[in-house]
Structure formats: C-alpha cells, structure tokens
Amino acid sequence: DFDCPPDWSAYDXQCYYAF
C-alpha cells in the first residue's frame, strides 16, 4: 500500500491521479 490521497491510485510504487 502507498500513502496516496483517496482519489489517487497507487501503481508501481507511485501515485497516479485519476483524471
């Protein structure tokens, strides 16, 4: 698990924002 904002998705150790 990654510490990302609720609206973000964690993938490959990074956080991506769902546009």
UniProtKB/Swiss-Prot annotation:
Main location (coarse class): secreted
C-type lectin domain span: 11-19
Cellular compartment(s): Secreted
GO cellular component: extracellular region
Source organism: Vipera ammodytes ammodytes (Western sand viper)
SS bonds (residue pairs): 4-15
Oligomer and partners: Heterotrimer; disulfide-linked. The heterotrimer consists of 1 heavy chain (a metalloproteinase) and 2 light chains: LC1 and LC2.
Function: Regulatory subunit of the blood coagulation factor X-activating enzyme. Activates coagulation factor X (F10) in a calcium-dependent manner by cleaving the Arg-Ile bond at position 234. Weakly hydrolyzes insulin B chain, fibrinogen and some components of the extracellular matrix in vitro, but does not activate prothrombin or plasminogen.
Other facts noted in the record for this chain: Calcium is required for ligand binding.
Keyword Disulfide bond: yes
Record keywords, A-Z: Blood coagulation cascade activating toxin, Calcium, Disulfide bond, Glycoprotein, Hemostasis impairing toxin, Metal-binding, Secreted, Toxin
Post-translational modification: N-glycosylated.
GO molecular function: metal ion binding; toxin activity
Tissues showing expression: Expressed by the venom gland.
Similarity remark: Belongs to the snaclec family.
Protein name: Snaclec factor X-activator 2 light chain 1
Organism ancestry: Eukaryota, Metazoa, Chordata, Craniata, Vertebrata
